[in-house]
Amino acid sequence: MNKRMNELVALLNRYATEYYTSDNPSVSDSEYDRLYRELVELETAYPEQVLADSPTHRVGGKVLDGFEKYSHQYPLYSLQDAFSREELDAFDARVRKEVAHPTYICELKIDGLSISLTYEKGILVAGVTRGDGSIGENITENLKRVKDIPLTLTEELDITVRGECYMPRASFDQVNQARQENGEPEFANPRNAAAGTLRQLDTAVVAKRNLATFLYQEASPSTRDSQEKGLKYLEQLGFVVNPKRILAENIDEIWNFIQEVGQERENLPYDIDGVVIKVNDLASQEELGFTVKAPKWAVAYKFPAEEKEAQLLSVDWTVGRTGVVTPTANLTPVQLAGTTVSRATLHNVDYIAEKDIRKDDTVIVYKAGDIIPAVLRVVESKRVSEEKLDIPTNCPSCNSDLLHFEDEVALRCINPRCPAQIMEGLIHFASRDAMNITGLGPSIVEKLFAANLVKDVADIYRLQEEDFLLLEGVKEKSAAKLYQAIQASKENSAEKLLFGLGIRHVGSKASQLLLQYFHSIENLYQADSEEVASIESLGGVIAKSLQTYFATEGSEILLRELKETGVNLDYKGQTVVADAALSGLTVVLTGKLERLKRSEAKSKLESLGAKVTGSVSKKTDLVVVGADAGSKLQKAQELGIQVRDEAWLESL
């Protein structure tokens, strides 16, 4: 029976690849169904012999308890956006300062959800959401139900790949029709539908909704020397790669491709929101490197957003956690990019003055970045009133005088005891990218604050289970879960805490870099600003902001109270030792190591202060080689780069 099961699995997987990947099926649907039923019968009779790559794993039927957090071995960065030809020219100019004659590759920007797939010996072991780029959610069981994701590869290798999971337009129409017939609310657009599907705990629902993928990058160190070759290799392994792409030598060629794609966009069977432009050569990518948030070798051109007219009804003013007062327009409802919009940001007082926005104006509304509704401009021909908008002089939360500094575009409340700022700071502290306290969302925080149960973030860790029962709508089970989530967050690595403190200019990526270097918040507290400013990708603005924050008496008291309540202040990831043997060196691993796993070798190099990259370039300091090192060894020798072997690495 085992032989026949192997034959059936191989046949069915081949036919599935022909259907979903190549769009060239060699058997009829009825023949596929007959073989599939035969396999199901054999697996029912011999469950102990079910193969890891059996297509029956895709049917669903498993109900999950939830999704566990998963740390990405290779971080997922965001891309810098471009919205005009001029911004593409500026990107090209920056690249050419480092790379004399770059070739670019242009790929479609799929409007879906970023995913990371990890394979060991060619078998899918983890499928993970992007999350914050460092930590995502393990949705492996759901991604196994996406029919074009291979459960096994054509080669038995360890590899991590990146891609987009999306819902084709035809599937979206079918899903919404079914929801309409069942009296359920329809999804606003295919991206929302894909996101909702991947968050399903019932894998059978995922299997029915016909999601699809395009893979676009090998995240683990690649043996290819260009993005184009990498895409072809992904196809060889069994992944679906979008065929619509070009190589370009200049911005004229890129712009022509963008115009062509823009005209074809509505006829595609899936949604796209732009074109991604990357430097094709991987060694040049290494030379260009990264900022804190994004690669310097890529940019995402975004298509112009859809625009609609709406009438301005009124303006609300709200205070953020840094004291900035933001105006929001209340509008007559309009349909915009698949959703109903009745509120849109007016950004700040300077923007209102610049656009000359007045009471009852008809305005043009769009979605900035296809996400945030914003007022773009006034339709002056439809103006009905010359009366200007009322600009507040006092904080809408604490009534303190508002200030408008010369170097800032927004009004600001500088009262440190402003209730709105404190509450927004608490919400930020508990958010996913910060301390990630499940269940402690804005509504619960507002109730805790109103009940005077929390005044600062340290108070969160003084809460007891019974405190939550004082809040309207919170039952015993929810109170227990909230308390447990707060206790669990005490064990977070310290970069989550640092970001959660809401220090100006210190984002999540900067927090991680700081803690990798200083190892604990207490060490960072003692550091001088010159040392902070010297860290690669950071600088004087962040250093000054930290110095200002830590100079306040309140920050010292808060850190002491957090430590007393049991909150971890130490970094739990891979740290950088300033005086380590390889501190500050860029190292490439290549070839097959005999004794160390590649992941072990990478971890050891990083623990010794090295930055491990995938391609050899002029910025590479050292190459560690194993057997069959190939082109990377040859390039290192051509560039005169130091070469060492596995035994040398083990001796350190």
UniProtKB/Swiss-Prot annotation:
What cofactor does this chain's UniProt record say it requires?
Mg(2+); Mn(2+)
Which cellular component terms (GO) are annotated to the entry? cytosol
- The entry's active site is 109
Keyword presence, Ligase: yes
Q: Per the UniProt record, which EC number(s) apply here?
A: 6.5.1.2
Q: Where does Zn(2+) bind?
A: 395, 398, 413, 418
Q: Which organism is it from?
A: Streptococcus pneumoniae (strain 70585)
Q: What does this protein do?
A: DNA ligase that catalyzes the formation of phosphodiester linkages between 5'-phosphoryl and 3'-hydroxyl groups in double-stranded DNA using NAD as a coenzyme and as the energy source for the reaction. It is essential for DNA replication and repair of damaged DNA.
Tell me a GO biological process for this protein: DNA replication
Q: What class of enzyme is it?
A: ligase
| Record key words, sorted | DNA damage, DNA repair, DNA replication, Ligase, Magnesium, Manganese, Metal-binding, NAD, Zinc
CDD domains found in the cross-reference section: BRCT_DNA_ligase_like, LIGANc
Please report the stretch or stretches of sequence annotated as the BRCT domain.
Answer: 577-652
Query: Which catalysed reactions does the entry list for this protein?
Result: NAD(+) + (deoxyribonucleotide)n-3'-hydroxyl + 5'-phospho-(deoxyribonucleotide)m = (deoxyribonucleotide)n+m + AMP + beta-nicotinamide D-nucleotide
Q: Which family does it belong to?
A: Belongs to the NAD-dependent DNA ligase family. LigA subfamily.
Q: What is this protein called?
A: DNA ligase
Q: Which SMART domains match?
A: BRCT, HhH1, LIGANc
Q: Which residues bind NAD(+)?
A: 29-33, 78-79, 107, 130, 164, 278, 302
Which GO molecular function annotation, any one, does this entry have? metal ion binding
**Keyword Nucleotide-binding annotated:** no
Gene3D superfamilies xrefs: 5' to 3' exonuclease, C-terminal subdomain, 6.20.10.30, BRCT domain, DNA ligase/mRNA capping enzyme, Helix hairpin bin, Nucleic acid-binding proteins
